[in-house]
């Protein structure tokens, strides 16, 4: 987690490796937008709103912004 409350090391902010920060956002998006045995997939709009909502606490705010604006929205057009 970007805010340092993550397991196991409690790394915070830029101390978290860049690749890990990217995977955190991508994994969360995939988990929300894929069907699971215990629930149906959530909408892309909802997943984006959750990524934005938790930007700065769970997610690196810059990575979250780039993922939403450059990756997701660019692919919708």
Regions found by a protein language model. Give the residues of each.
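Metal-dependent catalytic cores of enzymes that make or break cyclic nucleotides
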Residues: 1-77
């Amino acid at each position: 987690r970007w805010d340092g409350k993550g397991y196991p090391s409690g790394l915070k902010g830029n101390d978290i490796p860049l690749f890990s920060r990217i995977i955190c956002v991508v994994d969360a998006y995939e988990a929300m937008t894929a069907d699971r045995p215990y629930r149906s997939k959530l909408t892309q709009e909802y997943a984006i709103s959750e990524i934005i909502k938790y930007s700065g606490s769970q997610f690196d705010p810059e990575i979250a912004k780039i993922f939403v604006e450059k990756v997701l929205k660019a692919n919708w057009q």
